Amino acid sequence: MSTNVVSIKDIKREKHAIDASGKILGRLATEVATILMGKKKPTFVPYLDIGDYVVITNASKIKLSGKKMKDKIYTRHSGYPGGLTVETFDKVIVKKPEFIIEHAVRGMLPQSKLGRQMIKKLTVFAGPAKGEVKEEK
């Protein structure tokens, strides 16, 4: 018995279209991260990027459970003294709804070059898709 080693030319990528309206952020992000990593493929190996492409539409209609709409915070720092900016989920979803899903998915991918390569296969739209996208789920 021998082990099959996957080569880059053998990788076949599909395009998954997911509608985020009414879905809970964390559950959607885990589903997307699994697809981007290719974990459900029989040829999965942790050192290769064999995942599929994912297009998410209606990011502005995502939901959170509980009181997280007001309690969840996003922070960033400018690098200057006193440069900490704190925003709640309510404010961020209005300004840049794409960022919320990208941020959640990025945290579930490997924190390495491979993870940075995987996140490039994710496309998020705030509203309906631009162009032609095949729907799934």
Where are these regions (language model features)?
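Ribosome large-subunit tunnel/peptidyl-transferase-proximal elements
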Residues: 1-103, 113, 126, 131-137
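Positively charged, solvent-exposed patches that mediate nucleic-acid binding
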Residues: 119
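Acidic, metal-associated active-site segment
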Residues: 106
